[in-house]
């Protein structure tokens, strides 16, 4: 009996003494906002509420993805570091909560790189008054979206003036690479589908540049509305945002890495472009 009690006590002691990262497998977005930090010392930590753990490759999921959550994801990567995360069935819509409409569904920050792996069906919808992209690229390094298992989808929709994937209102976005997954990106009120956000009437275009789509990626990108009561220029499907207060549409940019460059000749009318699946690089 004493041996059994001793063994039980030892097991409990070991469980308590294990680092938090050894006990954490998945992070549930239902439980609150999640922040991932990749620091210059080579460490990556994940914070959610009072939980703070070392985790080099976290998976963020949701217990019931049929229900929208207004909780958000932030990734901050220091210079010369790469932050990694897997999205596995999250359904974030900060516009669905009246108290969270100024929040960004998913944003990246810092001077490092960010890698996102897709599993399952994922939705990122930033609140209307956030003026942000659905997946808001704020880091100055690269943003790469992968789908190694070929089972991931991502639907990203921007808030007012924001791109689907890329810059928020009055912000450019560059160095975006999509190598896999089925991606639908919708800009809002002049934001590009993938690329820059909307700019104001007297400002320069918010550029979307160095955008590469390759591998098994299937992408549908739709720029924000062209005409409404505010006379806003449409965002390109892939490229620059439009100009708000002036009917000037954003310009498309060449997309590197894909065999078939998207046809955006009718962008002003249709505000939509599709990229076909291919395994070969553009021009090869």
Which residues does each PLM region occupy?
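A composition-driven surface/loop motif
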Residues: 6, 22-284
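Sec-dependent N-terminal signal peptides of Gram-positive bacterial secreted proteins and lipoproteins
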Residues: 3-22
């Amino acid at each position: 009996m004493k041996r059994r009690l001793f063994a039980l006590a030892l097991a409990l002691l070991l469980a308590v003494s294990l680092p938090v990262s050894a006990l954490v497998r998945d992070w549930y977005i239902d439980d609150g906002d999640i922040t991932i930090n990749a620091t210059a010392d080579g460490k990556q930590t994940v914070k959610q509420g009072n939980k703070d753990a070392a985790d080099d490759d976290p998976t963020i999921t949701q217990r019931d993805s049929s229900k929208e959550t207004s909780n958000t994801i932030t990734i901050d990567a220091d210079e010369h570091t790469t932050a990694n995360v897997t999205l596995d069935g999250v359904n974030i819509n900060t516009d669905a909560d009246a108290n969270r409409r100024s929040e960004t569904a998913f944003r990246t920050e810092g001077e490092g790189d960010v890698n996102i792996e897709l599993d399952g069906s994922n939705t990122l919808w930033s609140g209307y008054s956030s003026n942000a992209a659905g997946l808001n690229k704020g880091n100055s390094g690269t943003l790469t979206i992968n789908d190694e298992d070929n089972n991931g989808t991502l639907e990203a929709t921007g808030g007012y003036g924001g791109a689907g994937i890329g810059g928020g209102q009055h912000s450019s976005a560059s160095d975006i690479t999509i190598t896999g997954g089925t991606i639908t990106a919708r800009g809002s009120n002049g934001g590009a589908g993938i690329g820059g956000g909307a700019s104001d009437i007297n400002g320069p275009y918010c550029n979307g540049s160095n955008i590469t789509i390759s591998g098994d990626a299937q992408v549908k990108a739709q720029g924000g509305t062209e005409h409404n009561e505010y006379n806003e220029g449409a965002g390109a499907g892939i490229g620059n945002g439009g100009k708000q207060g002036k009917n000037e549409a954003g310009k498309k940019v060449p997309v590197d890495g894909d065999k078939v460059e998207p046809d955006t000749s009718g962008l002003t009318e249709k505000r939509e472009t599709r990229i076909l699946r291919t395994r070969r690089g553009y021009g090869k």
